[in-house]
């Protein structure tokens, strides 16, 4: 890529863990296999949205490493390049990803991999904010975190000593951005899938990836006995 071409693109990074290492809070409702199947479906959805945005290279940042067969499938089917998240807490890994991306492109967007409502247009709206001169763009999550962060510059203050996984992540990130005197935009809030009650909001096509067809028999756990469906109709 030439220098002029690099200036026109925004890298989109998707953070994901290997199936079986994510969405463990859904196991009581879905079973181990069901939770892994839903996780795969959500990751593919987010990578596909990144690809369809046509903003620039799509990078799948993988944990614990890039060797899981599912990640290799994403690379083969969707054209995402694979990158190891590496060591450290979530903030350290995000900072590392942004430093890598912004060394190659003037703008970068990072999203999670459990966002059913993520769309190519949402990503394009994020990049539009950065192209018009914002230093940061945030896609809030309904639970007090965020589903997306986009940057045109990187500062470690955004990522260090953040209470990741708590309800104050977004508020603390806003404070950090204000302290840096950065210009920032917030997009409409989206929801992510963390708890069994979130399953009720999934589109039907995503439910089909991990739930049996509606046959009146109900969901069953891995021993074949009926299990609680976590409120799903």
Task: Place the predicted regions along the sequence by residue.
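Conserved alpha/beta core of the MobA/IspD/sugar-nucleotide pyrophosphorylase nucleotidyltransferase superfamily
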Residues: 5, 168-233
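Short phosphate-binding loop-to-helix
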Residues: 71-107, 166-169
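A short, N-terminal amphipathic alpha-helix
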Residues: 39-56
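Short glycine-enriched, charge-decorated loop/helix-capping segments at active-site entrances
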Residues: 26-34
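Acidic donor-binding segment of Leloir-type glycosyltransferases
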Residues: 56-80
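Conserved donor-nucleotide/metal-binding helix-loop-beta segment in metal-dependent transferases, i.e.
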Residues: 118-143
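N-terminal nucleotide-binding beta1-loop-alpha1 segment
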Residues: 1-26
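Catalytic metal- and UDP-sugar-binding loop of GT-A-like glycosyltransferases, i.e.
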Residues: 111
């Amino acid at each position: 890529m030439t220098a002029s071409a690099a200036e026109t693109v925004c890298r989109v990074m998707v953070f994901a863990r290997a199936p079986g290492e994510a969405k463990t809070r859904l196991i009581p409702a879905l079973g181990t296999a069901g939770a892994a199947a839903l996780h795969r479906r959500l990751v593919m959805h987010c990578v596909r949205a990144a690809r369809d945005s046509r903003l620039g290279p799509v990078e799948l940042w993988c944990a614990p490493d890039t060797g899981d067969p599912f990640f290799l499938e994403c690379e083969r089917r969707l054209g995402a390049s694979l990158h190891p998240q590496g060591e450290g807490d979530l903030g350290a890994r995000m900072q590392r990803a942004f430093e890598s991306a912004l060394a190659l492109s003037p703008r970068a967007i990072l999203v999670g991999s459990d966002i059913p409502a993520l769309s190519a247009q949402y990503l394009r709206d994020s990049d539009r904010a950065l192209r018009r001169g914002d230093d940061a763009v945030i896609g809030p999550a309904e639970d007090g975190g965020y589903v997306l962060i986009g940057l045109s510059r990187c500062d470690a203050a955004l990522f260090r000593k953040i209470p990741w996984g708590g309800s104050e992540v977004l508020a603390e990130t806003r404070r950090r951005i204000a302290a840096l005197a950065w210009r920032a935009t917030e997009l409409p809030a989206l929801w992510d899938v963390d708890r069994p009650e979130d399953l009720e909001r999934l589109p039907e096509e995503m439910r089909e990836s991990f739930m049996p067809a509606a046959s009146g028999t109900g969901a069953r756990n891995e021993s074949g006995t009926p299990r609680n469906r976590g409120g799903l109709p």
